[in-house]
């Protein structure tokens, strides 16, 4: 693999020499940083099994190497990477996998270690969505996830990834993560804080990542991280699990933040060692049981992961002064909900008791039941999935609901050819050789729902959202 030139400030190298355990080679560290990062993917088990995915992609000649800490994660090598971007493959477009760096799969693995099965989870800094979608898959779309993102511009990307992966149990918020301890005290069974950091571990992906690095900025970032972990710890219920992670390497933003929390709340904080998380985890284990992953250990990004338990309640914070505002939705009455459920089932859309129908004007939404306790405490950017819009002739079913709820075995399902599927993703109407019988057609490819179409004569009218339409070369190789 080709080398690339990484910029290292002298003070950074001095700091790394001090931080690195004596069992590791500093020369190996420098050499690893100069190698481009291996690409990796995570199979979306909400859509397919690992075995079925491997069988589906076997003809492509992809070399898939298992990632030790994530059963559904693989490093990937492809001969035609330049000819067809991974994000333009049919399997990516239909949500069968997520392009995710191997190290970033560690925090969710830690969150669900030892059979942990939380029902209400918060992802404090969620965009672009790799960990939120991984959490949703581990929860099998059950329970509820609050996915927060402070950056307004990244909330849209977060929602797009959640929708593509067919996730229904997520509520999105757009807040500074420091508000949650006061706003929703002791409300979550598990919390992931993948904290904003100095990014020292990502130089293999971005050789200029350290251009603006300084010891002073590390200290400023660490101060924010302490405030974030304090807030998250308050939002965690007693007995709950908190995972703190960063993609940086210095101790100030990693071990020191966790030790500060322990010094602040004493016996209420219990560190849960991660040495048994996966075979070979001990190579990155610190004396406190954290994983401090230098890039040469597993040939991946630099990363840090800590897992802790809140053993007892702590004093609550003053209530926040902001006003949430009126909640513009109302629950749908049982009789009407039954009629809506029946109409949805006729086009292949079904859901279980984890989701409940709500209405806003002519919009119908499905909210995860587990998030209802937070209504009135925080303001949501988006809640659950939009099911339909009502009109005089019935319902206009929404694309995100089709991707999350549709069964490819429904009677109205119609399998497209590769060329027809590519036309669909380009936003064009499809003219199949043998037209389907149903008027509302569940369009599938590779036995995966990819949209809902109206049959007009021999034509399938495209309903693929304009913002998702793809140009350029796609999976058949045609531009």
Curated annotation (Swiss-Prot):
Classification via PROSITE patterns: NOL1_NOP2_SUN, SAM_MT_RSMB_NOP
InterPro entries, alphabetized: Methyltr_RsmF_N (IPR031341), MeTrfase_RsmB-F_NOP2_cat (IPR049560), MeTrfase_RsmB-F_NOP2_dom (IPR001678), Nol1_Nop2_Fmu_2 (IPR027391), Nop2p (IPR011023), RCMT (IPR023267), rRNA_ssu_MeTfrase_F (IPR023545), RsmB/NOL1/NOP2-like_CS (IPR018314)
GO cellular component, one term: cytoplasm
Catalytic reaction(s) noted: cytidine(1407) in 16S rRNA + S-adenosyl-L-methionine = 5-methylcytidine(1407) in 16S rRNA + S-adenosyl-L-homocysteine + H(+)
Annotated binding of S-adenosyl-L-methionine, by residue: 125-131, 149, 176, 194
GO molecular function: RNA binding; rRNA (cytosine-C5-)-methyltransferase activity
UniProt keyword annotation of S-adenosyl-L-methionine present: yes
EC numbers for this chain: 2.1.1.178
GO process annotations (BP): rRNA base methylation
Enzyme superclass (EC): transferase
Main location: cytoplasm
Active site per the UniProt annotation: 247
Cell compartment(s), UniProt: Cytoplasm
Protein family according to the UniProt entry: Belongs to the class I-like SAM-binding methyltransferase superfamily. RsmB/NOP family.
Entry protein name: Ribosomal RNA small subunit methyltransferase F
Provenance organism: Escherichia coli O6:H1 (strain CFT073 / ATCC 700928 / UPEC)
């Amino acid at each position: 693999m080709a080398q690339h030139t990484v910029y290292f400030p002298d003070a950074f190298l001095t700091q790394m020499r001090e931080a690195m355990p004596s069992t590791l080679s500093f020369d190996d560290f420098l050499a690893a940083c100069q190698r481009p990062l291996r690409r990796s993917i995570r199979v979306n088990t909400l859509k397919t099994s690992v075995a079925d995915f491997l069988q589906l992609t076997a003809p492509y000649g992809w070399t898939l190497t298992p990632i030790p800490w994530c059963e559904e994660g693989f490093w990937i090598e492809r001969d035609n990477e330049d000819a067809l971007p991974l994000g333009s493959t049919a399997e990516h477009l239909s949500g069968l996998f997520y392009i995710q760096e191997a190290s970033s799969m560690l925090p969710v693995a830690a969150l669900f270690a030892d059979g942990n099965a939380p029902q209400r989870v918060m992802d404090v800094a969620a965009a672009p969505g790799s960990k939120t979608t991984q959490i949703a898959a581990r929860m099998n779309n059950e329970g509820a996830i609050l996915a927060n993102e402070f950056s307004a511009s990244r909330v849209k990307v977060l929602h797009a990834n959640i929708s593509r992966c067919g996730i229904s149990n997520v509520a999105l918020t757009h807040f500074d993560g420091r508000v949650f301890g006061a706003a929703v005290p002791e409300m979550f069974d598990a919390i992931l804080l993948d904290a904003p950091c100095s990014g020292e571990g990502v130089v293999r992906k971005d050789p200029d990542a350290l251009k603006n690095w300084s010891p002073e900025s590390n200290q400023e970032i660490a101060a924010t991280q302490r405030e974030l972990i304090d807030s998250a710890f308050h939002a965690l219920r007693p007995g709950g699990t908190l995972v703190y992670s960063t993609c940086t390497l210095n101790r100030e933003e990693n071990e020191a933040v966790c030790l500060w929390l322990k010094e602040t709340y004493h016996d209420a904080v219990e560190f849960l060692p991660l040495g048994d998380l996966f075979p070979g985890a001990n190579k990155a284990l610190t004396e406190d049981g954290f994983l401090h992953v230098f890039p040469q250990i597993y040939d991946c990004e630099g990363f840090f992961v800590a897992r802790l338990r809140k053993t007892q309640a702590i004093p609550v914070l003053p209530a926040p002064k902001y006003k949430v505002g009126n909640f513009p939705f109302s629950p749908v009455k049982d009789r009407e909900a039954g009629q809506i459920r029946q109409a949805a089932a006729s086009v292949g859309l079904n859901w279980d008791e984890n989701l409940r129908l709500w209405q806003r004007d002519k919009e119908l939404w499905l909210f995860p039941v587990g998030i209802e306790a937070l209504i009135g405490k925080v303001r949501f950017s988006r809640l659950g999935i939009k099911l339909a819009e009502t009109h005089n002739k019935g319902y206009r079913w929404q694309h995100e609901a089709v991707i999350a709820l549709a069964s490819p075995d429904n009677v109205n399902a119609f399998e497209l050819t590769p060329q027809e599927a590519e036309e669909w993703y380009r936003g064009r109407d499809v003219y199949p050789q043998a037209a389907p019988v149903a008027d509302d057609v569940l369009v599938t490819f590779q036995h995966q729902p990819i949209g809902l179409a109206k049959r007009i004569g021999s034509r399938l009218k495209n309903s693929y959202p304009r913002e998702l339409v793809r140009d350029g070369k796609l999976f058949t190789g045609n531009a």
